[in-house]
């Protein structure tokens, strides 16, 4: 089956002042030749004078073949197919928005192309027709090319009726919903941070337990926090959530509470690993580490209460 392709948006060419994602294909005396990734890889050029606001000493430090770049459109000749681009005129904020738009548009593209493959489309025109009857309908409806379709597809995960007004037959609708669910259903992520908490004063382990319990009080119903002892004075904090950003925020908040509470008792608090999303491999390694330490400490009394602390509601 031939590889199908189509531009991401309804318009075949970008407009002047649009910030677009390109891939650098080659570098010549006049500038860099690039492919506009959102427009089915049509060619554009970044003139050397538009690479940087500073004096150019080494082109390779500014732009490299094979790398993706966010650039702004400064001229379009639709008749001749010429597109002039600038890298130096793109602000950091514009680049971030461009990357976000590209990521979401690419997700929509991946969904629709897979739908086309499942339905055994053989021509690019068939994929374009699917775009016209789905993604571009939402882009036009919400006046947000790239975002309209992504937001609508995301909504369709919980409310498939969003797709009711589209010109789709039963097979197309079924396959589209299956692929939207497969790609856009939220996946729970585990977030982890490693900390050191100790108190060598009179209150000792009681001060540590009190500080950790204070951190656990930052738990919510949707984001319960767990704290496990790795080896004194090191602990691992974890939470599982559908919202990555909120999960990171909750762990950071809990760490701040623990730090404040233990330092009130003249204890010590150090961050060994900032909160981050962990993979299955990380989790497997942590489980092995905890199992090994549990065996080593099996005959040691007095630490049972500190080995694992979970958010609980006091009776």
Swiss-Prot record:
Gene Ontology terms, MF aspect: RNA binding; translation initiation factor activity
Disulfide bond annotation, renumbered to this chain: none
Keywords of the record: Cytoplasm, Initiation factor, Phosphoprotein, Protein biosynthesis, RNA-binding, Translation regulation
Phosphoserine: residues carrying this PTM: 49, 52
Residues annotated as domain S1 motif: 17-88
Chain segments annotated as transmembrane: none
Post-translational modification: Phosphorylation at Ser-49 and Ser-52 stabilizes the eIF-2/GDP/eIF2B complex and prevents GDP/GTP exchange reaction, thus impairing the recycling of eIF-2 between successive rounds of initiation and leading to global inhibition of translation, while concomitantly initiating the preferential translation of integrated stress response (ISR)-specific mRNAs.
Top-level taxon of origin: Eukaryota
Xref: Gene3D superfamilies: EIF_2_alpha (3.30.70.1130), Nucleic acid-binding proteins (2.40.50.140), Translation initiation factor 2, subunit 1, domain 2 (1.10.150.190)
Protein name: Eukaryotic translation initiation factor 2 subunit 1
Lineage per the UniProt record: Eukaryota, Metazoa, Chordata, Craniata, Vertebrata
């Amino acid at each position: 089956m031939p590889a199908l392709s189509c531009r991401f948006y309804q318009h075949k060419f970008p407009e002047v002042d649009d910030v677009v994602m390109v891939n650098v294909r080659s570098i010549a005396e006049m500038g860099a030749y690039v492919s506009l990734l959102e427009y089915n890889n049509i060619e554009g050029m970044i003139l050397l004078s538009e690479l940087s606001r500073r004096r150019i000493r080494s082109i390779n430090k500014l732009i490299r073949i094979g790398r993706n770049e966010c650039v702004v459109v400064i001229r379009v000749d639709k008749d001749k197919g010429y597109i002039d681009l600038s890298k130096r005129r793109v602000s950091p904020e514009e680049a971030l928005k461009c990357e976000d738009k590209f990521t979401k548009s690419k997700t929509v593209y991946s969904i629709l192309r897979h739908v086309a493959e499942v339905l055994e489309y053989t021509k690019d025109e068939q994929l374009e027709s699917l775009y016209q009857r789905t993604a571009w309908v939402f882009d036009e409806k919400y006046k947000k090319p790239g975002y309209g379709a992504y937001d609508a597809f995301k909504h369709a995960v919980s409310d498939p009726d969003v797709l009711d007004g589209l010109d789709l037959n039963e097979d197309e609708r079924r396959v589209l919903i299956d692929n939207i669910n497969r790609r856009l259903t939220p996946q729970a992520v585990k977030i982890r941070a490693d900390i050191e908490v100790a108190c060598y004063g009179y209150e000792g382990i009681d001060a540590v337990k009190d500080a950790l319990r204070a951190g656990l009080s930052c738990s919510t119903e949707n984001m319960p926090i767990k704290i496990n002892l790795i080896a004194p004075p090191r602990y691992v904090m974890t939470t599982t959530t559908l919202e990555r950003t909120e999960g990171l925020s909750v762990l950071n908040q809990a760490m701040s509470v623990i730090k404040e509470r233990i330092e009130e008792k003249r204890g010590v608090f150090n961050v060994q690993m900032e909160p981050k999303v962990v993979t299955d491999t990380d989790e497997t390694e942590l489980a092995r580490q905890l199992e090994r330490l549990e065996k080593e400490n099996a005959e040691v009394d007095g630490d049972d209460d500190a080995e694992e602390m979970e958010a609980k509601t006091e009776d």
